Structures are given as structure tokens and as C-alpha cells.
């Protein structure tokens, strides 16, 4: 009998499909319709099953050894089904967001906080309400004759003018404390010390050299270099062990030889020769010292034996980045590039990212130009896709001049180093796309089969799924008004699965963790954009599904943050990992969680109270773990506290906010929301102005908190986080809690009494007061406003902050 005529097809006699939600969550599915998992977390409406693809004959595929490279390739872990109904989401419903200021012209990436607030009508109404209430409160106190602008601490002079008023935190009695006798943890309670510390950061960042000659500048670099013995015996080994696995851009065998030559030259002539890159090499050494110092500083908090880092911590590296900036951007026009110059730009980019002094800006966007310069220099130097596409033996040819610096020896050594640098720059390019929605600077990718392996660890691994990340970029940026959400979710899921099978070693594990967290944050941003769009289109069923997904992913990300700050991990790499958790907590604490709370039904008091406590726990962790060291976080502490007070004290909060804004549109529509703003309030919030007689349906809180033991446990975990921080040492609890105006001696007793009692009379039903017209616009607006504010805040909590 001809065997080909009787091919046996493999048949399955059991159900093998699982619902799409369980597949995403990698959970065991009971195959119900809906399954118990989806029912438990409240997303049963999205519990869907995909039919199996037709089975293949068993003997139609031979052994693995018989397969060609193209047959071995697995194009997708999840098959793309052309039969799905395409669904499009507009991620810029209010248009692309530009900001023009004296200091910078900026188009914000679509997943920055600014763009999320611009896109989300609920959050935009909330933040506008907050701005108006605070501004009017301060205007009210100006009328009392108190000179608020005069109240500023001497230590704040290094901060921007917009930040000066935020430095007045302490009650008057704190002036008498002997700071030298405070315990380190207790000293954090004195918020003025934090402001003073951050002012020093900014002074170092804006360092002025006086005589700006090259000679003076080079002499300062030479003076800042560490002792050769300390550098070679302590700093370089520390960097190689803990930091180089994260930033594999230097070949230290040859680099150490160049260091010895540089120090010998300095000892003879005490000068630097830019023609042979000595100034650039010296600046690379300074940045290595800076990174090691930051690493040691954050490692000490989690290490038992701090003496291991003593020699590195004793270095003063605060001005090193300022010194390097001139060499990186000022001494030589960006027309040609060398290896040292490329390495210097990459390390400067890293220092901006991990530094506590806000090198990347409030929206994590200010290094985009520097990143573009890095990518352009890579392309100019040949550090590009060609290095991984082509064979080293037959397709790549390098000539090395005898005067080249540094001289690595053979062609293969250059190619190996260039490949690592290229993969690192590629990884960074895709990471920023995932975190902020920034369009990729590297506008190309390749699906390689088999994926090339060059013995470079994680640098090789990212090549396996880069085409998927680039696909996400294209789907978002081809037309942000019309994003195929099914295809976008498919690409994200496939990327997650590819990352999930990668092997990790000890010191590169944080790179994989960072990539996975970045992808989770991208998922969060995608789902949030869906929710905002469904609210605009009135699709209630899709709203419920998106809200449940957003809620679940939010508490999962929050749990990962709790885990990170509860375990030491690799202490020497916390300086690097802190940033990704800072970005996540910033997004959750300032945008996502307030938006979730504002959308919860008023009738669900238990769920609402639980999420307000969740926000308090998250804020305590965010500002205590990160806000004490990072300027970007510290600067957001005031708005974080006001957000919490609004959500904590406001019964029927969203209803009250909309009525307040509609009232403002009727009475003060032309008044600027903030200084220099010429836009009318009704133009800023067109959806709120759509019907001034009744609340728009899209602002009606209709959602319930998803149920289930897993979600409840994750919420409780975050609620209990605040117990870690003693009441008096919880920066989030104490900030603006005990603040007092420094009242001039000429202030009358009656004025002081009125200030002291301003926040004592509170009622629970804010919606009733805000909706009443008795105090209408005929001369009684001030009394109406102040009653509303008194119900929300103790004005002293923020009068001292503006």
C-alpha cells in the first residue's frame, strides 16, 4: 500500500483552546463561556475564543534536521488571523500636543503625562479644576495683604522661579532645630533641606567657569580626574563588574592601556590634546566616576557593609556632568565622529537618565535631541544594521590608520565592539518608544532567521524581537488618528512572549526586567487610550472592558513596584533600575490612578474608599522611596498631595468638578487658567462646555472596581505599604500638612485668626453646595468659592506653596 495515500492526520480529542484573556495573562483556563477567571476579575464580556487552525499531516514534516532556515523560523507565537474585524482608535482626539515656551519648543510624545492629560477628558477636567482652585485661593490670600511672593527660603536660590514658592514647607518652630543633631531619617522630615539639596543639583548643572578659555577648562578637567591608583584598582573594576553589563560600549582591555598613556602624558605636560582625543578620554573617565558614585550611593541603602563603597563615595562628582557637556557639545562641531566621542555621548545620555537632577525633564523628553545625535553619529561611523546583517568574513571590510585612537588591533575587534554599541543604542531607541510613545529614531528593522548570535549576551537577544517593537512603533505613528488596535495588541503580545523565553544571567537580568516593565507600561498606555476613545464614542460595553483591563494592569504594575522596593536585588544596579520604576510610579500616581478613582460609581463606596487608600499607599512609596533623591519626583509632590486631598475629601467628586467648571465658564470664561494662557476655559474643555445645563454623559462615573481575591490582595498590598513609613517620617504625609505662612509682625490679629481657622468648617455634601445657585455670580462669588475650598482643603496646606 502506498503510504502517501493514507496519511494519518493528527486529531485532538480534547478541548485545547483557551480564552484570549487567559492566554495574555498566562493563566489556567477552565474553558467556560465565560471562563471563571474572566468572571472573577470582571471582564467576562471580553472572554473570547479563537478557533484552532487546521491540523497538519503527521508525516508532512520531517525531522528538525531536515528543515531549512526559513522553515525553522517561527514568525509568530500567536497566529495573525486576517478574519478579525478591524477596530480603530484615535490616540490624538484633541490633536498633537505642542508647547511653546521661552526655553523650548516641544512636541510631546503621545504617551507622556502631558499628552495623556490632553487626551483624557476626565483627567483634563480634574487638573484644570485643581489649577483654578489653587490659583483662586492664592488670589484670595493676596487680598488679605500677606506678601506671599516674599516668603522663600534662602537655600532655594538655585531652583527655577516657578519652584521658589514650593520650598516653604516647615512650620516656624522647625527653624530652632539643631540640624546637626537630627538622625538622617528624621532630617528628611524637614522639607527645606530637600529643597536646598535640589537647588545645589541645579547649581552644579548650570556651572559657570568664569574664564571660559579652553586652557582653564582643560585644567579643571585634569584637576577633577581621580588618582590613577584609585581609578585602576577600585573604580574601573567596580564599573566592569556592575555597570558595564548594563552599558556594554567599552572594551576595557584596550581602554586601560589608553588610560595609562593619558595619565603619563598629563604627568609630563599637564595638558590635554584634543587632536588625539585626550580631552574626550578624560571626560569618559569622569563619567565612569560619576556612574560609579551614583551606583555606590544607592547601593549603600540596601547593603549591609557600606565600607565596600567608601573610597568611591568620598569622591565629589557633582560637577562632572557639567564639565563633560562642553566637550560633548561645544568644543567640536558635530560634523565628524570618533569612537571616543560616540562613547562619550552615550554615557552622557545615560547620566542624564539615571541622575537625580532631572536631566530628562518633567516629561522624560528633553534628551531626544541628544539621542538623535547619537543615532546620526552611529550611522555616520558605520555602527548600523550592516554589522548584524552582513558576514564579518566576506561582507565587511575595515581599514585602520596607524594613528587611529583607540587602536583595537584587528578588524574583528572593531566589529565586535561596534555590534555591542549598536545593539545598545537600538535597545535605548525602542525603550523610549515604549515608555513615552516617542517615534523611533532608527527607522528600520529586520526579521532575521535564524537570529544572529555574536556572543554578546542580551545585546544579541534584542535582535530576536526588534522587528516586533518596530512594528508597534509603525502602528502608532503611521497615523495616530487611526490605529488598528487589534494589530497593535497582537504585536505587544508577541513581544511579551519573545521576551518571556530569554535567558538571563545575574548582572544582565535588570536589562530584561527593564524591557518587560517598559512593555507593560506600553500596554497600560494603549489600554488607557482605548478607554478615553470609547468614552468619546459612547461605547459603554467597550468602556467596561477597557476599564477592567486598565485597573487590573495598574494593580499588577503597582505590585511590581512594591516588590522592587521591598527586596535588595543587585544593590549596585539600583541607580539604574530606580528610573524605570520612577517613570512607572509617576504615570500611575499622577495620571492613571486618579483617573480610575474619578470613574468609579458613587454608589460603590467600599471600592472607592479602597482605591483612595491605594493612592495614599502608592504616594507614600513614590515620594518616600524616590522623592527624597529625584528632583522630578520631588517637584510633583505638591500636586500629588492636592490630588489626594481632592479625591479623599470630595463626595461625588466628578459631579462637583464638572459643575464648578461649568460655573466658571458662565462667570469667568475669559480668565486665564494659568499665567500667560490666552485660551478660554470653554475652548480648553469643549466637552465640559458641550452642555452647560447638565453633566455630559461621558463624565458620569459608571464603573465598578473589578472583583476577585487576586485584585483584592494586590490592592491591600499597596494599602499596607504606608505602614512602612512612620507617620513623622512619611514625607507624603507631612508635606504641606503642618506648613504655616511666615506672617509679618504687622499682620493684624484678626487676619491671623482668620487664616488659622480657615479650614475648620467642613461639610460632607460638597455637591450640594457646589450645585446651589444661592451664592451666584452677583458679588458673592468669593464666599461661594471659599466655602467650596474649605470643604476640600485646609487652605494653609497650600497657601504657603504659592
Swiss-Prot record:
Domain of life: Eukaryota
Main location: cytoplasm
One GO CC annotation: nucleus
Keyword Zinc included in the entry's annotation: yes
Region annotation Disordered: where it falls in the sequence: 749-779
Membrane-spanning intervals of the chain: none
DNA-binding region per UniProt: 19-47
CDD domains xref list: fungal_TF_MHR (cd12148), GAL4 (cd00067)
Molecular function via GO: DNA-binding transcription factor activity, RNA polymerase II-specific; RNA polymerase II cis-regulatory region sequence-specific DNA binding; zinc ion binding
Keyword Ribonucleoprotein: no
SUPFAM superfamilies: Zn2/Cys6 DNA-binding domain (SSF57701)
Known role: Transcriptional inhibitor with a significantly increased number of target genes in response to oleate.
Family stated for the protein in its record: Belongs to the OAF3 family.
Protein name according to UniProt: Oleate activated transcription factor 3
Name of the gene this protein is made from: OAF3
Amino acid at each position: 500500500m502506498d503510504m502517501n495515500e493514507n496519511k494519518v492526520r493528527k486529531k485532538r480529542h480534547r478541548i485545547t483552546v483557551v480564552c484570549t484573556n487567559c492566554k495574555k495573562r498566562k493563566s489556567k483556563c477552565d474553558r467556560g463561556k465565560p471562563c471563571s477567571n474572566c468572571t472573577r476579575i470582571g471582564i467576562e464580556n471580553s472572554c473570547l475564543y479563537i478557533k484552532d487552525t487546521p491540523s497538519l499531516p503527521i508525516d508532512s514534516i520531517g525531522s528538525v534536521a531536515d528543515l531549512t532556515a526559513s522553515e525553522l523560523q517561527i514568525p509568530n507565537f500567536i497566529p495573525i488571523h486576517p478574519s478579525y474585524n478591524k477596530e480603530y482608535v484615535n490616540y490624538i482626539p484633541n490633536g498633537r500636543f505642542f508647547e511653546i515656551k521661552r526655553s523650548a519648543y516641544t512636541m510631546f510624545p503621545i504617551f507622556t503625562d502631558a499628552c495623556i492629560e490632553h487626551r483624557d477628558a476626565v483627567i483634563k477636567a480634574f487638573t484644570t479644576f485643581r489649577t483654578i482652585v489653587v490659583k483662586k485661593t492664592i488670589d484670595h490670600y493676596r487680598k488679605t495683604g500677606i506678601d506671599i511672593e516674599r516668603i522663600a527660603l534662602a537655600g532655594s536660590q538655585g531652583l527655577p522661579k516657578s519652584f521658589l514658592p514650593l520650598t516653604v514647607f516647615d512650620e516656624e518652630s522647625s527653624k530652632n532645630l539643631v540640624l546637626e543633631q537630627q538622625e538622617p531619617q528624621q532630617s528628611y522630615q524637614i522639607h527645606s533641606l530637600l529643597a536646598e539639596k535640589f537647588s545645589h543639583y541645579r547649581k552644579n548643572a548650570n556651572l559657570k567657569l568664569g574664564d571660559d578659555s579652553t586652557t582653564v577648562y582643560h585644567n579643571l578637567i585634569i584637576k577633577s580626574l581621580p588618582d590613577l591608583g584609585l581609578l585602576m584598582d577600585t573604580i574601573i573594576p567596580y564599573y566592569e563588574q556592575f555597570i558595564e553589563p548594563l552599558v556594554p560600549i567599552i572594551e576595557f582591555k584596550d581602554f586601560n592601556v589608553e588610560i595609562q598613556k593619558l595619565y603619563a602624558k598629563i604627568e609630563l605636560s599637564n595638558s590635554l590634546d584634543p587632536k588625539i582625543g585626550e580631552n574626550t578620554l578624560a571626560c569618559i573617565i569622569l563619567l565612569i566616576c560619576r556612574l560609579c558614585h551614583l551606583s555606590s550611593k544607592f547601593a549603600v541603602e540596601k547593603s549591609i557593609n557600606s565600607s565596600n563603597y567608601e573610597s568611591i563615595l568620598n569622591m565629589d562628582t557633582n560637577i562632572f556632568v557639567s564639565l563633560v557637556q562642553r566637550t560633548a557639545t561645544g568644543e567640536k562641531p558635530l560634523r565628524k565622529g570618533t569612537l571616543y566621542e560616540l562613547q562619550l555621548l552615550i554615557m552622557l545620555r545615560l547620566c542624564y537618565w539615571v541622575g537625580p537632577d532631572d536631566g530628562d525633564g518633567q516629561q522624560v523628553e528633553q534628551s531626544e535631541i541628544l539621542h538623535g545625535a547619537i543615532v546620526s553619529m552611529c550611522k555616520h561611523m558605520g555602527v548600523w544594521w550592516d554589522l548584524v546583517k552582513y558576514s564579518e568574513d566576506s561582507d565587511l571590510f575595515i581599514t585602520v590608520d596607524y594613528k587611529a585612537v583607540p587602536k583595537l588591533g584587528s578588524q574583528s575587534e572593531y566589529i565586535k565592539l561596534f555590534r555591542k554599541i549598536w545593539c545598545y543604542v537600538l535597545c535605548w531607541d525602542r525603550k523610549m518608544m515604549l515608555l513615552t510613545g516617542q517615534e523611533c529614531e532608527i527607522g528600520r528593522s529586520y526579521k532575521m532567521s535564524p537570529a544572529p548570535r555574536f556572543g554578546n549576551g542580551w545585546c544579541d537577544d534584542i535582535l530576536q524581537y526588534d522587528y516586533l517593537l518596530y512594528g508597534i512603533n509603525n502602528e502608532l505613528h503611521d497615523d495616530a488618528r487611526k490605529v488598528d488596535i487589534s494589530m497593535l495588541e497582537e504585536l505587544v503580545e508577541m513581544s511579551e512572549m519573545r521576551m518571556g523565553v530569554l535567558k538571563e544571567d545575574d548582572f544582565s537580568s535588570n536589562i530584561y526586567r527593564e524591557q518587560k516593565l517598559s512593555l507593560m507600561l506600553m500596554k497600560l498606555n494603549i489600554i488607557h487610550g482605548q478607554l478615553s476613545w470609547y468614552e468619546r464614542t459612547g461605547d459603554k460595553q467597550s468602556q467596561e472592558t477597557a476599564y477592567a483591563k486598565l485597573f487590573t494592569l495598574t494593580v499588577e504594575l503597582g505590585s511590581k513596584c512594591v516588590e522592587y522596593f521591598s527586596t535588595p536585588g543587585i544593590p549596585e544596579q539600583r541607580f539604574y533600575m530606580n528610573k524605570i520604576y520612577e517613570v512607572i510610579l509617576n504615570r500611575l500616581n499622577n495620571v492613571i490612578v486618579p483617573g480610575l478613582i474619578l470613574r468609579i460609581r458613587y454608589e460603590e463606596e467600599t471600592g472607592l474608599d479602597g482605591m483612595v487608600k491605594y493612592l495614599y499607599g502608592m504616594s507614600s512609596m513614590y515620594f518616600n522611596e524616590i522623592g527624597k533623591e529625584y528632583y522630578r519626583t520631588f517637584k510633583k509632590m505638591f500636586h500629588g498631595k492636592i490630588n489626594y486631598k481632592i479625591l479623599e475629601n470630595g463626595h461625588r467628586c466628578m459631579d462637583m468638578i464638572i459643575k464648578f467648571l461649568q460655573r466658571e465658564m458662565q462667570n469667568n470664561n475669559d480668565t486665564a487658567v494659568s499665567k500667560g494662557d490666552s485660551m478660554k476655559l470653554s475652548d480648553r474643555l469643549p466637552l465640559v462646555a458641550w452642555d452647560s445645563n447638565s453633566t455630559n454623559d461621558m463624565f458620569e462615573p459608571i464603573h465598578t472596581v473589578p472583583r476577585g481575591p487576586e485584585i483584592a490582595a494586590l490592592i491591600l498590598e499597596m494599602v499596607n505599604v504606608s505602614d512602612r513609613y512612620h507617620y513623622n517620617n512619611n514625607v507624603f504625609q507631612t508635606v504641606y500638612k503642618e506648613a504655616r505662612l511666615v506672617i509679618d509682625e504687622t499682620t493684624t490679629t484678626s487676619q491671623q485668626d482668620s487664616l488659622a481657622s480657615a479650614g475648620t468648617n467642613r461639610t460632607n455634601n460638597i455637591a450640594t453646595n457646589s450645585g446651589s445657585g444661592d451664592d451666584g455670580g452677583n458679588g458673592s462669588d468669593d464666599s461661594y468659592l471659599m466655602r467650596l475650598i474649605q470643604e476640600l482643603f485646609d487652605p494653609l496646606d497650600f497657601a504657603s506653596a504659592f
